A protein has these predicted regions:
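Solvent-exposed loop/turn segments at secondary-structure junctions
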Residues: 164-165, 211-213, 236, 254-256
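...with weaker cross-activation on analogous glycine-rich loops/strands in unrelated enzymes
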Residues: 209-240
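Acidic, glycine-rich loop-and-strand cores that form catalytic or ligand-binding grooves
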Residues: 182-212, 219
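Extracellular/periplasmic catalytic domains that process cell-envelope and extracellular macromolecules
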Residues: 116-118, 150-152, 197-199, 221-223, ...
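N-terminal secretory signal peptides
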Residues: 1-37, 48-50
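Near-N-terminal "mature-domain entry" segment
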Residues: 30-184, 188-192, 257-273, 277-287
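Active-site-proximal beta-strand/loop segments in catalytic clefts of secreted hydrolases
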Residues: 128, 160, 207-209, 232, ...
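Active-site scaffold segments
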Residues: 175, 228-232, 237-270
């Protein structure tokens, strides 16, 4: 199949994603918009400066800790702990207006070839266990996953073959799932940067029910706020080809990591095998 937006044949190995052509806009329209933006920036900037002066005086009046105003010190400490613990090299993927979403092509059928009994399907989760102990196993129905907070996001899905599509996804954050069901820690406590670092599993493995497709993630990616256990695409329930009943969506990574039809999730102390990494692609597959 030839895809017009890709200059690389699909079989030629990893291709860099290309920027997609956007709707052409006249110079005049661009200038009008720029002028509006500048006016708004002045206004927003002025309000921010005022808030800054008021806030700054409040901060300077507060008692000092470590040569820094107390409230500032505490915020920096808390954020610093979280950031250094989990989001050292992280950013957020750009989100788009929902109206930009387009149908996503079907790509990749490993692990989807056998019939899936919708009634029999359960998400199996293997908890993180200290070495030499038997891990906890817990089963979840789709309804239990759907009972968690629903998050919707419109992000760009990028396949390593060189094409991309903006898609609206809905599901639950893997981090929210783990807040309710604390299976990523050996203590069974929710993820918390104040816990000893060894309490948290460094890796996650996701495998289809038939074990034909499998993905490995670092825990930082699994806990990222845009990493979803996803059950809806472009406003409709996921179809089997797109990974029903549950797939992974993690928009800072290429499509190869967005495993469709998740059967088992396991929290591990070793980097798990990954379908495309064992075939020569980068294990992290970030972009
Ligand atoms: N189970 C499973 N998940 C998979 C694949 C696969 O072959 N099997 N292919 C991956 C690749 S390479 C891509 S680009 C996306 C495509 O998702 P889509 O079919 O919903 O577009 O699924 C990913 N997840
Ligand atoms: Mo892909």
């Amino acid at each position: 199949m030839a895809y017009p937006e890709s200059s690389q044949p699909a079989a030629s190995g990893p291709a860099l994603p290309e920027s997609q052509p956007t709707t052409p806009v006249s110079d005049e329209a661009v200038e009008r918009q720029a002028a509006r933006r500048t006016r708004r920036a002045f206004l927003v900037g002025g309000v921010a400066a005022l808030a800054g002066i008021v806030g700054w005086n409040w901060l300077l009046d507060a008692p000092q800790e470590d040569g820094l105003a107390g409230p500032l010190r505490r915020v920096l400490d808390a954020n610093g702990r979280l950031a250094t613990a989990y989001f050292r090299n992280t950013r957020l993927a750009t989100e788009f207006p929902k109206s930009h979403a387009k149908p996503l092509r079907k790509n990749g059928t490993e692990g989807l070839k056998s019939a899936l009994g919708a009634v029999a399907w359960r998400l199996q989760v293997q908890g993180y266990a200290p070495a030499g102990t038997t891990p906890r196993m817990q089963e979840f129905t789709l309804d239990e996953v759907k009972a968690l907070p629903r998050v919707e996001m419109t992000t760009e899905f990028k396949c390593i073959e060189g094409w991309s599509t903006i898609v609206t996804w809905a599901g639950t954050r893997l981090s929210d799932f783990l807040a309710k069901y604390p299976l990523a820690t050996s203590s069974g406590r929710p993820v918390d940067p104040n816990n000893p670092p060894t309490d948290l599993a460094p890796y996650v493995s996701l495998v289809t029910p038939d074990k034909e497709y499998y993905v490995g993630l670092e825990i930082e990616s699994a806990l990222h706020p845009q990493t979803l256990l996803c059950y809806e695409m472009n406003g409709a329930p996921l179809t089997p080809e797109h990974g029903a009943p549950l797939r992974l969506v993690t928009p800072l990574k290429y499509g190869i990591k967005h495993i469709k039809r998740i059967g088992t999730i396991a929290f591990l102390d070793q980097r798990p095998p990954d379908y495309w990494a064992v075939r020569g692609y980068d294990w992290h597959a970030g972009h």
